Amino acid sequence: MIYTTTETIPGRDIIEIVGVVTGNVVQSKHIGRDIMAGLKSIVGGEIRGYTEMLSDARDVAINRLVASAAQKGADAIVGIRFTTSAIMDGSSEIMAFGTAVKLGPSR
């Protein structure tokens, strides 16, 4: 499966738009990370525990996005974007979305 943030794929024509596909995950914060994050915010700097958590969550969202497109018979996903939002206190959602397409042969 080809997936990209661009609207086109070099050397390939989009022959059919399958539709919008999404992949999301809601990730809760770990109480230990929350305590360390609070301390880190006092002195400044990167909160690595949260950075790792969001990176892992983004990977899950991408995997779900690709699975959704494959289930619909797509060859690729173009125009991928990400959103992040707070769902409730202590948890965040990461959503990946894009357009599932079918591709013609290589030019």
Swiss-Prot record:
Belongs to the UPF0145 family. This is UPF0145 protein Sfri_2095. Gene3D superfamilies: Hypothetical protein apc22750. Chain B.
